[in-house]
Amino acid sequence: AADSAKKYLANLTNEDGSRKYSDELINSLSGYIENDLADNGKVDKNGKDKFVDVVTGEDAGVDKADITNAYATRSSLLIMRNVTNVYVGDITVDNPANHSVNILDSRNISAENVKVFSYDGNNGDGLGFGCSQNVVCWNNFTDTGDDNLGFGASVGEGARDCDIQTNSEIWMFNNFLREGHGGLAAGSHTGNGIQDVLFEDTVMNHIDMAFRFKSSPTNGGFIANITMRDCAVADTQQAWVLTTSYSDPNSASTTEFAEIGKFYNFASYNVSVYGVQYNTLQVLADVDPVKNPNKPWHTHSHLYFQDITFGNVGTNG
């Protein structure tokens, strides 16, 4: 991860073609970055555009935007794209620099007996299926630093102009998910739609948000026809989260604005949730049409819950 960030910074140039940062300066940043991860305090929070040492107040000489983009160059461990008939099984993934396994723009995918150990690693997602169809995912174990089992479907208006398939026809069952930000996690890339998902017979423990559905005001698309049933959740911060107010601080890309995404046709049956610190259910539509035209009036609809049991709900639940 450090090598890719250094290479990115070394290739940046000024308007006259000269190098923006010297090797000496780039090499000196290692300590800053390590301390930032250790105590969450090295990037200045007061509106300045430079990367600074908050202890001494000295300017480290690097733009914040360049640090953000360099950090985003960390490589994922395994990426497959535009493939048909994929089987991933009987492997262990340990401490990836970024995402663990991503299968994109593909069809007919099976993932079985994959063990992912990326807990406390930033963006250490477990198994991800982006713009892929006909996915079966079962008997896996994920102990992750970010989302455990995730989906995505492109972003922005440009996604509609491309021949990109929806993320659909997904069956996930008999998985054990531990730690992580989201157990079942769909979005925030929703531009071409995520739909027709059956998620069942799964145990989730110490997940921040067990069922996590997210989009941002400009990503567009939808999440629809999601069924969650026969699952057990313990020690979570929030059980169900549906929001169009999500933003990714590590994103290094920009896209043409799309109409705001919507969530509809969600069904949850026979789910037990024990130990909820905050919300049992949060549904948020980010609406601000007067101040921000990219946040028009929209609603999420047709959300059905049956035989849901909550226990030991916290004071904020």
Q: What are the roles of these predicted feature ranges?
A:
Residues 1-317:
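Extracellular/periplasmic carbohydrate-active domains that bind, remodel
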